[in-house]
Amino acid sequence: MEIIIFDTQQQLDAYAAELIVNTVNKKPNAVLGLATGSTPIGIYDKMIELYNQKKVSFRSVTTYNLDEYVGLQPQNDQSYAYYMNKHLFSHVDIPEDQTHLPNGMADDIDAECIRYDTMLEAQPVDIQLLGLGHNGHIGFNEPDVNLSGGTHAVKLKDETREANARFFDSMQEVPTSAVTMGVGSILKADTIVLAVRGADKAEIVKEALTGPITTSVPASLLQTHARVIVLLDREAGRMLE
C-alpha cells in the first residue's frame, strides 16, 4: 500500500486524475471503476481539463460505477447516473453505451446484481477510484458481520443517509437502499486509488489503513490488495504523520 499526503486538495485531485489518465494513455480501452460523492468532483474536473488540453481521449474506455440508489430515476438530479453525466461523461468523448451503473430502477434487483457482476467478470477493472465513508464504508458496503463479495442490494445505515442528506431537500428524501459492487468485486481491480480529504475522516483513515482487517471497517480489507494507492490531504492524513 502506497500512501501519499498532499498539502492541498488541488494537488490530490491533479495526482489522482493523472493516475487515471496515464492508465488510459497506456491502454486506450481501459476499464475504469468510478465513484461519486464530493471527493471525486475535483478529480473529474482535472480529467476534463486534461481532455480539453487533448492529453487524453476516453472514446475507447469503458466505465463501471460502484453504486446507485434504489428507486431514483437516472434523470433525478440526486441519482448517481445524473451525477456522472454532470461531472464527467457529458464533458468528454466517452460513448454513452460504454458507461455503466447499476440500475436502481430494475424490476428485479437480484437479477440486476447478477447482470452487473457478469459484465464486471467480462471486463475487469484496470483502475478503481474509491472514496471513504465516515464509518469505513467503500461503495455502499456498510460495516457488517458478513460482507457480500459481489454486487448486491444494501439497506443504508442512518449515519450514511445523514451524511448524504446534504444533497437532498430533506432526510426523508434520501433513499433507504442502494445497489453496490461488493468488496470482493472492488478487490478484483488491478489498481485501487483511495482518495480521502478532510479532518473529519482522519480517525477512520487511521483505522482503515493501520488497524485490524475487519468487516466492521470495510475499507480495512483494502490492506489485503496488492496495489492500493491512498491519496490524502493533510487533514485526512494527520493521524498517520
Predicted regions and their residues:
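N-terminal glycine-/serine-/threonine-rich phosphate-binding loop
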Residues: 1-32
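Glycine-rich N-terminal segment of FAD-binding domains in flavoprotein oxidoreductases
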Residues: 26-52
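A glycine-rich beta-strand to alpha-helix segment
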Residues: 30, 38-39, 43, 119-143
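Short beta-strand segments
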Residues: 33-37, 65, 102-103, 129-132, ...
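Short glycine-rich anion-binding loops that position phosphate/pyrophosphate groups of nucleotides
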Residues: 38-39, 69, 134-137, 199-200, ...
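Ligand-binding beta-strand-loop-alpha-helix segment within the catalytic cores
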Residues: 58-128
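Class I SAM-dependent methyltransferase SAM-binding "motif I" and its flanking Rossmann-like core
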Residues: 139-183
